[in-house]
Swiss-Prot record:
GO MF, one example: transmembrane transporter activity
Residue numbers bearing the Phosphoserine modification: 25, 31, 542
Keyword field contains Transport: yes
Comp. bias regions, Polar residues: 533-548
Tissue specificity comment: Detected in brain (at protein level). Detected in brain, in synaptic layers of the cerebellum, hippocampus and cerebral cortex.
Family that this chain belongs to: Belongs to the major facilitator superfamily.
Transmembrane segments: 88-108, 123-143, 157-177, 181-201, 210-230, 239-259, 317-337, 374-394, 402-422, 425-445, 458-478, 490-510
Organism of this sequence: Rattus norvegicus
Compartments in which it is found: Cytoplasmic vesicle, Secretory vesicle, Synaptic vesicle membrane
Coiled-coil region(s): none
Protein name (Swiss-Prot/TrEMBL): Synaptic vesicle 2-related protein
Length: 548
C-alpha cells in the first residue's frame, strides 16, 4: 500500500480503486479533478486523456492487468548464455575495427618505401580512411534507427569485408587510396554493434559488459602488430591486408545468428517478433519470461536528426559531440606523438632532431624494424589497465565523473611532458596518458547509448562517432605539423582540449548511472524513469529523471 501511495503522489493520473467504487462527484467529473481517499490520506489527482489508439504506459495501466515492457523482460531474464555469445560476436566486430585502424600505422611506411611515395601521399592514405568514417557514421546510425540495428550492422560489415579484401589487390596508389576510403566508409557502421549489444543487457551488467567489449579493441591492436611481425618480412603487406579481414569474415558468417533488437521491434510495432526474440533469449538463458502482455511503445518517427536537438536533448548532444571529438583528437594524437617522442628521446630533443632532418629528401624512408613493432606493441598494451580502471570507477563515480577524471589525468600527463625527462619517465607518462584517454573513450561508449531513447539511439551514437572521426582527421596536423614548429604549443593544445572536455562532461545534464534505457522520446510517458529499482533509502524512485 505504501508503494501505491507513492506512485499516486508522483503521477498526475487517475488509478482504478481496488474496491471498484466511484469516489467522484458530478462536479469532479465536470472539472476532471478529484481526490482519492486511501487509508485516511487524501491525494489530489488529475485526469489525463489519451489519444485514440495510444498505448497506455505500464505506470498508468489498471493494476489488475499483468503487463510488462521490454526493459522488464530484459531485467527478468538477466545475463546468461545468450549475452555471452553476443559479447563474443560483438567483440569480433570491435576487433576487426581496431585491426583496420592499427594497420594504418603499419601500411603507410611500407608503401612509402615500396612505391616511393612523397610524405603528403602517405598522410593522405591515413586521412582518407577517417574521411570515409566521418562521412558515413551518421548514415549508418540513420539506417540502424530506420531499418533495424541488425540490418545496419550487417550491411556495414559486408561492405568493409568486401573492400578490405579488394585493397589487398590494389595495383597502384590511386586504387588503394579509393579502396581504403571505402573501407573507412564501412567501418563507420561498426559502432552500431554497441547499440545492438546494449539493448540486450540488464541494467546492472550494462556498463561492465560494454567496457569488457572494449577489451576486444585492445586485443585487435595487439593481434595486428603481432601479425605484422610474422607476415610483413616474408609475405608482405598484401597478405597482411587479407589476413586482417579474418575477424570480419568470421563475424559475417555468424551474424545470421544475431536477432534484431526487441526494443527496436516494439518501437516499430512488431510485437510478435519482439516476443519471439525475448522467448528465445529466455530459453537460451534458462530463465522464465515475465507473465502478462508485452506493452507496445508509442510508434514514432525514428532516426530523425531533429530529435537530437529537441529542448531536452540539445545540450546533451552538443556536449557529447565535443567530448567525442576530444577523445579521438587526443587518443590518435597521442598515438602519433608517441613515435615522435620515442625517436627523439624526450621533448627537449625534438626541435634539434627536426632541424637535423629538414634537409633530407622527402622520399627518404625506413622500413619498420622489429624494435619499432615492439614499441607499437608496448604502447598498445596500456589500454588494458585503462579498461580495468574505468571498469572499477564507472559504477562508483558515475559516467560523467569517470569521463571527467580520465580527461583531467590525460591533461596532467601532457603538462608533465613539458619537463625534460628521461626515456623511462617519458614511457611511464605516455603509458598512463593512453590508458586514461582510452578509458574516457570507453566511458563515452557506455554513456551515449544510455542517454538517448530507442528511437534515436543509433543515430545519436552515429553522429558522436562521426564527430570523433573529425577529431581523428584534424589531429595529424597538430601532432605532426605543429610539432615541427613548437612541441610545447602542441602539448598545450592537447592538454587544453582535454580540460575543456572534462568541463563538458561535468555539465552533461543527465547522469545515466542506474538508469534504464529509454524506450520513447516522449517525456509524458516517463522517458527518464530510473530503472524500476529503488534508491539508496529503499524508496521507489519517481520518473523525474537523473538530471543534475
Amino acid at each position: 500500500m505504501e508503494e501505491d501511495l507513492f506512485q499516486l503522489r508522483q503521477l498526475p493520473v487517475v488509478k482504478f480503486r481496488r474496491t471498484g467504487e466511484s469516489a467522484r462527484s458530478e462536479d469532479d467529473a465536470a472539472s476532471g479533478e478529484h481526490d482519492v481517499q486511501i487509508e485516511g490520506v487524501r491525494v489530489g489527482l488529475e485526469a489525463v486523456e489519451l489519444d485514440d489508439g495510444a498505448a497506455v504506459p505500464k505506470e498508468f495501466a489498471n493494476p489488475t492487468d499483468d503487463t510488462f515492457m521490454v526493459e522488464d523482460a530484459v531485467e527478468a531474464i538477466g545475463f546468461g548464455r545468450f549475452q555471452w555469445k553476443l559479447s563474443v560476436l560483438t567483440g569480433l566486430a570491435w576487433m576487426a575495427d581496431a585491426m583496420e585502424m592499427m594497420i594504418l600505422s603499419i601500411l603507410a611506411p611500407q608503401l612509402h618505401c615500396e612505391w616511393r611515395l612523397p610524405s603528403w601521399q602517405v598522410a593522405l592514405l591515413t586521412s582518407v580512411v577517417f574521411i570515409g568514417m566521418m562521412s558515413s557514421s551518421t548514415l549508418w546510425g540513420n539506417i540502424s534507427d530506420q531499418y533495424g540495428r541488425k540490418t545496419g550492422l550487417k550491411i556495414s560489415v559486408f561492405w568493409t569485408l568486401y573492400y578490405g579484401i579488394l585493397s589487398a589487390f590494389a595495383p597502384v596508389y590511386s586504387w588503394i587510396l579509393v579502396l581504403r576510403g571505402l573501407v573507412g566508409f564501412g567501418i563507420g557502421g561498426v559502432p552500431q554493434s554497441v547499440t545492438l549489444y546494449a539493448e540486450f543487457l540488464p541494467m546492472k551488467a550494462r556498463a561492465k559488459c560494454i567496457l569488457l567489449i572494449e577489451v576486444f579493441w585492445a586485443i585487435g591492436t595487439v593481434f595486428e602488430v603481432l601479425l605484422a611481425v610474422f607476415v610483413m618480412p616474408s609475405l608482405g603487406w598484401r597478405w597482411l591486408l587479407l589476413l586482417s579481414a579474418a575477424p570480419l569474415l568470421v563475424f559475417a558468417v555468424l551474424c545470421f545468428w544475431l536477432p534484431e533488437s526487441a526494443r527496436y521491434d516494439v518501437l516499430s510495432g512488431n510485437q510478435e517478433k519482439a516476443i519471439a526474440t525475448l522467448k528465445r533469449i529466455a530459453t537460451e538463458n534458462g530463465a522464465p519470461m515475465p507473465l502478462g502482455k508485452l506493452i507496445i511503445s508509442r510508434q514514432e518517427d525514428r532516426g530523425k536528426m531533429r530529435d537530437l536537438f529537441t529542448p531536452h536533448f540539445r545540450w546533451t548532444t552538443l556536449l557529447l559531440w565535443f567530448i567525442w571529438f576530444s577523445n579521438a583528437f587526443s587518443y590518435y594524437g597521442l598515438v602519433l606523438l608517441t613515435t615522435e617522442l620515442f625517436q627523439a628521446g624526450d621533448v627537449c630533443s625534438i626541435s634539434s632532431r627536426k632541424k637535423a632532418v629538414e634537409a633530407k629528401c622527402s622520399l627518404a624512408c625506413e622500413y619498420l624494424s622489429k624494435e619499432d613493432y615492439m614499441d607499437l606493441l608496448w604502447t598498445t598494451l596500456s589500454e588494458f589497465p585503462g579498461v580495468l580502471v574505468t571498469l572499477w570507477v564507472i559504477d562508483r563515480l558515475g559516467r560523467k565523473k569517470t569521463m571527467a577524471l580520465c580527461f583531467v589525468i590525460f591533461s596532467l600527463c601532457s603538462l608533465l611532458l613539458f619537463i625534460c625527462i628521461g626515456r623511462n619517465v617519458l614511457t611511464l607518462l605516455l603509458f598512463i596518458a593512453r590508458a586514461f584517454i582510452s578509458g574516457g573513450f570507453q566511458a563515452a561508449y557506455v554513456y551515449t547509448p544510455e542517454v538517448y531513447p530507442t528511437a534515436t539511439r543509433a543515430l545519436g551514437l552515429g553522429t558522436c562517432s562521426g564527430m570523433a572521426r573529425v577529431g581523428a582527421l584534424i589531429t595529424p596536423f597538430i601532432a605532426q605539423v605543429m610539432l615541427e614548429s613548437s612541441v610545447y604549443l602542441t602539448l598545450a593544445v592537447y592538454s587544453g582540449c582535454c580540460l575543456l572536455a572534462a568541463l563538458a562532461s561535468c555539465f552533461l545534464p543527465i547522469e545515466t548511472k542506474g538508469r534504464a534505457l529509454q524506450e520513447s522520446s516522449h517525456r509524458e510517458w516517463g522517458q527518464e524513469m530510473v530503472g524500476r529499482g529503488t534508491n539508496s533509502t529503499g524508496v521507489p524512485r519517481s520518473n523525474s529523471g537523473s538530471q543534475e
